[in-house]
A protein has these predicted regions:
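Terminal helix/beta-alpha structural elements that buttress the NAD(P)+-binding lobe
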Residues: 2-36, 43-79, 86-377
Length: 377
């Protein structure tokens, strides 16, 4: 049961939508959904564009056109539904978060409606455009490290030494948004042997975030360098027990990782696997089943896992606490540094969305998150 919209809120609003694979984006007028029990209606001011948006707009990944896009928002609470389970949100609060389940939760629109546990209050001293670049990939890092690797990330963080502090964990594509947050999360939870693989220009920053050592994936012998660094496996474990592939590219990451992984190595791969990148002239090619990628190239006993962040809600603790409590606390405490930003300009919401898509398609961004304004205050 939903409530009626407050009289100050418009019954319809504009949203950016896909129209066909690789076709120009368009603006569509959509209904404003009143918040039901435990829900929050948010006036969206900022959003980000992610590789998933490109995969959907150019490759039609898991959607039917026309489709609303966007999974990260920063905005202001416009209306609260009844029966709020926590007394932590007020109309007018500045908030941010990660949503993905239905059109009413898509973020490339001026109003969106979601559940209370998908909402983070903006901490003092953090700009909204910074926060909008955090939740999607910070949640991805938490989900991957716990669900795919089986690592423990208890909250609150316990005092004392992490018994796996010396275990080597390779973060391949560490300069990406997911990579940045994975490195920081691992550091904060006491994993001290994080091996970051990224272009050399990012190494100094990655060490500031928590990487113990960095290697450049453009080096022809990068696999040999990583294996030399980690040395022999301990207690029957593989030399590299965990590899997080933050990119999921057949040519760009997986061929090298297949050389690195051995029996017992858990390899978590961001989905979809990019078999062929989108270009101005060619459509992308994707694969959602990691076990169909590079058949015959993986050593026997390697555990391949396709990361599906949307499943994080199956973890009841994370569902109730990750966005509503943990993410804003880590930002407020300065534990997590937001990604470096690139503000995408344009005269209209549609133009900004299209400009962001073009930047993603041309692979023109490295080590930055694309954010853009949705609506004015």
């Amino acid at each position: 049961m939903s409530t009626a919209l407050a009289p100050t809120i418009p019954p319809t609003h504009p949203a950016v939508v896909t129209t066909a694979p690789r076709a120009p984006l368009a603006t569509l007028t959509v209904p404003t959904v009143p918040p039901g029990p435990g829900q929050v209606l948010i006036h969206v001011l900022w959003t980000s564009s992610t590789p998933l948006d490109l995969h959907q707009a150019d490759g039609g990944l898991l959607i039917t056109h026309p489709a609303l896009m966007g999974s990260s928002y920063g905005g202001v609470v416009a209306q609260l539904g009844p029966e709020q389970p926590r007394d932590h949100l007020r109309v007018g609060d500045k908030v941010f978060g990660f949503t993905f389940r239905g059109d009413e939760e898509k973020c490339h629109q001026t109003y969106m409606t979601t559940d209370w546990y998908m909402v983070s209050k903006l901490p003092e001293g953090v700009r909204m455009e910074e926060a909008v670049a955090v939740s999607v990939n910070l949640v991805t890092a938490f989900h991957t490290l716990t669900a795919d690797f089986g690592l423990e990330l208890p909250w609150p963080v316990p005092a004392g030494e992490n018994r796996e502090r010396d275990t080597p964990i390779v973060v391949w594509g560490a300069a990406s948004s997911v990579g940045n947050y994975a490195v920081q999360v691992l550091r904060h939870w006491g994993f001290e042997n994080v091996v970051a693989v990224a272009r050399a220009k990012h190494h100094e920053y990655l060490k500031e975030l928590g990487a113990k050592v960095c290697f450049d994936y453009t080096d022809g012998d990068v696999v040999e360098k990583v294996l030399r660094y980690v040395g022999e496996g301990k207690e029957g474990k593989p030399r590299v027990p965990y590899v997080l592939d933050c990119i999921g590219s057949l040519e760009g990451t997986l061929k090298k990782i297949a050389e690195l992984a051995e029996r017992g190595t858990k390899v978590a791969i961001m989905l979809p696997v990019i078999v062929k990148h989108a270009t101005e002239k060619e459509a992308p090619v994707y694969e959602m089943d990691v076990n169909k990628v590079l058949p015959g190239a993986w050593k026997e006993g390697v555990e391949l896992k396709g990361t599906r962040t949307h499943f994080y809600l199956q973890n009841e603790f994370f569902k109730d606490h990750l966005q509503s409590e943990i993410v804003p606390a880590l930002l407020e405490q300065g534990v997590i540094k937001p990604n470096k930003l690139k503000i995408v300009e344009g005269k209209t919401m549609l133009e900004r969305a299209e400009n962001a898509r073009q930047l993603l398609r041309s692979q023109a961004v490295s080590g930055e998150k694309l954010v853009w304004r949705v609506a004015d205050e």
